Amino acid sequence: MELSTVNPQTLANGLFRISFQALGTQCEISYSTNSGKVATDFRDGTLYWIRSFEKRYSRYIPDSLISQINRSAGLSPVQIDSEDHRLFKLCDTLHFLTQGVFDPTTLPLSNIWDFKAEVPTIPSDSKIQHALEKVGWGRVDLQKDCVYLPEKGMGLDFGGFGKEYAVDRVTEIAKNFGITNAMVNLGGDIRTIGSPRKTDTWRVG
């Protein structure tokens, strides 16, 4: 995702829109400002943050933090920073509020399902049970400066809430640039603030 290839599209009434691919999906952000410089600076700040977020937390990127943690399962803790710790604490909260339904350690289960197979098959009960034995957010050892998965084969996947978290953060970035009217749509996960000029509502579908 190159910044130079994602230019704000100027719409009517001071409304701008940027469209791009990130986080494995199509993204679109609409926002209003009277300043062309603010429109461009917000674009740059947003795309930089999203690119950094994806590089750090995507399990599909070999050198991401999540990939490092997964490779180190059962071997050694992995150092984290304050932003990482904030994200892991959010996982704690979501796991508690959903009574365990939300669990970022379900990667072993995801790995036994081949969703790209021409003829999908259901994993055997023994494979499912074996994968379940490596699942459990409560087993994750989270410290202020490191995180550790205690058993080899355990794995994290932030796909269940990564885009939602990113939507909230991009909305905060907009506010930091003085933008009070915006719609952030990252692959169907949407948040709005304010409203477009000349109308009271954002169109989401």
Question: What do these predicted ranges mean?
Answer:
Residues 1-205:
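Mature catalytic core of soluble alpha/beta enzymes
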